[in-house]
Curated annotation (Swiss-Prot):
Residues 23-34, 61-70, 145-163 have a biased composition (Basic and acidic residues). Residues 71-81, 112-122, 131-144, 178-195 have a biased composition (Acidic residues). It comes from Mus musculus. Pfam families: MFAP1. The gene is Mfap1a. It comes from the Eukaryota. The modification Phosphoserine is found at S52, S53, S94, S116, S118, S132, S133, S361, S432. Keywords: Acetylation, Isopeptide bond, mRNA processing, mRNA splicing, Nucleus, Phosphoprotein, Spliceosome, Ubl conjugation. This is Microfibrillar-associated protein 1A.
């Protein structure tokens, strides 16, 4: 049973494609439509054989090995004809055979020649022993013995080198055979791939597809980004160095200007004696001012103590005789209708300054206009603004809230007004310092 016949006996292969090439019994290839069948988990596909194909695989392997064995001699012949090392080795082997035959004629007992290093050394040792015995018998000098030993060592070394060359050639031959067998296997697998079931194509999204060009473009982009980052870092470093240099220059210029300003000061015309006299005058004035303030404070304390010791009649007579002196007494002016009021302040009024002597009751800005001619609804402060007042004046307005708690007439309010409320009781006694106990 041959391989093609075994392959042809296999059932037709089902595929998801529309049509597949199929070889018939005559060897013709034709396209046949494939019926797509539904996949069922655990069910054997229709294209899978019922029996195992181990026998066919073994038969195919046996045929393949036979072909490889037949191809080996041809390759060896070609290699031997083309490789000079093999030719030299063959010549050497023929020479060794002739020498071995000659040695067999002389030696009665047969001798086995091995190819390993230990056997070669044993042969050399036996040859040395035989040669030494012969030399002792024939009384050959030591120089001849050394010469023969050297020749034997050289011959053993040459044989070893030739064996190494043979092994290298065999390795090359094996590698060539393996490559050829791999190529044959690839061809065979390619043919098998044609006969194997075709798998369903899997869709890959466009953003997930990566080609060689895209990979190279991505690597190039990464390289450009790294170069750009290095360039930006170098620019930042240069900019930082430039800023540091500018700051250093500014500091140096500032130091130079300060030194120049100090040098520009002319202290040659100064007179220490005049400066000392001016300082003495300032110190004397300060001492005099502090003494006057201290005397004024003591005088004020003495006056307060004197006024406290006076009786009520004496105090009133003293105040009438010596009234309080007001430095910046303001004349009470007349305000216009709806004029704003400004308080001039209560501090520093004892200083004799022009600003404290001004008339603060004089109208300003819109207070110059006559607001009496305005309608009644507009005669309020800040009309049309969020801070406008509800009433023009409170003189004619009753703002009493009769709904409040303190406006109600109740027993609690009456008791409060009679006992605790100030200004509503019929008591006109002067309150004492101690709090009286009420029962």
């Amino acid at each position: 049973m041959s391989v093609p016949s075994a392959l042809m006996k296999q059932p037709p292969i089902q595929s998801t494609a529309g049509a597949v090439p199929v070889r018939n019994e005559k060897g013709e290839i034709s396209m046949e439509k494939v019926k797509v069948k539904r996949y069922v988990s655990g069910k054997r596909p229709d294209y899978a054989p019922m029996e195992s194909s181990d026998e066919e695989d073994e038969e195919f392997q046996f045929i393949k090995k036979a072909k490889e064995q037949e191809a080996e001699p041809e390759e060896q012949e070609e290699d031997s004809s083309s490789d000079p090392r093999l030719r030299r080795l063959q010549n050497r082997i023929s020479e060794d055979v002739e020498e071995r035959l000659a040695r067999h004629r002389k030696i009665v007992e047969p001798e086995v020649v091995g190819e390993s290093d230990s056997e070669v050394e044993g042969d050399a040792w036996r040859l040395e022993r035989e040669d030494s015995s012969e030399e002792e018998e024939e009384e050959i000098d030591d120089e001849e013995i050394e010469r023969r030993r050297g020749m034997m060592r050289q011959r053993a070394q040459e044989r070893k080198n030739e064996e190494m060359e043979v092994m290298e050639v065999e390795d090359e031959g094996r590698s060539g055979e393996e490559s050829e067998s791999e190529s044959e296997y690839e061809e065979y697998t390619d043919s098998e791939d044609e006969m194997e079931p075709r798998l369903k194509p899997v869709f890959i999204r466009k953003k997930d597809r990566v080609t060689v060009q895209e990979r190279e473009a991505e690597a190039l982009k990464q390289k450009e980004l790294e170069q750009e980052a290095k360039r930006m870092a170098e620019e930042r470093r240069k900019y930082t160095l430039k800023i540091v240099e500018e700051e250093t220059k500014k500091e140096l210029e500032e130091n130079k200007r300060s030194l120049a300003a100090l040098d520009a000061l002319n202290t040659d015309d100064e007179n220490d004696e005049e400066e000392y006299e001016a300082w003495k005058v300032r110190e004397l004035k300060r001492i005099k001012r502090e003494r006057e303030d201290r005397e004024a404070l003591e005088k004020e304390k003495a006056e307060i103590e004197r006024m406290r010791n006076l009786t009520e009649e004496e105090r009133r007579a003293e105040l009438r005789a010596n009234g309080k002196v007001i430095t910046n007494k303001a004349v009470k002016g007349k305000y216009k209708f709806l004029q704003k009021y400004y308080h001039r302040g209560a501090f520093f009024m004892d200083e004799d300054e022009e600003v404290y002597k001004r008339d603060f009751s004089a109208p300003t800005l819109e207070d110059h206009f006559n607001k009496t001619i305005l309608p009644k609804v507009m005669q309020v402060k800040n009309f049309g603004r969020s801070g406008r007042t509800k009433y023009t004046h409170l003189v004619d307005q009753d703002t009493t809230s009769f709904d409040s708690a303190w406006g109600q007439e109740s027993a609690q309010n009456t008791k409060f007004f009679k006992q605790k409320a100030a200004g509503v009781r019929d008591v006109f006694e002067r309150p004492s310092a101690k709090k009286r106990k009420t029962t």
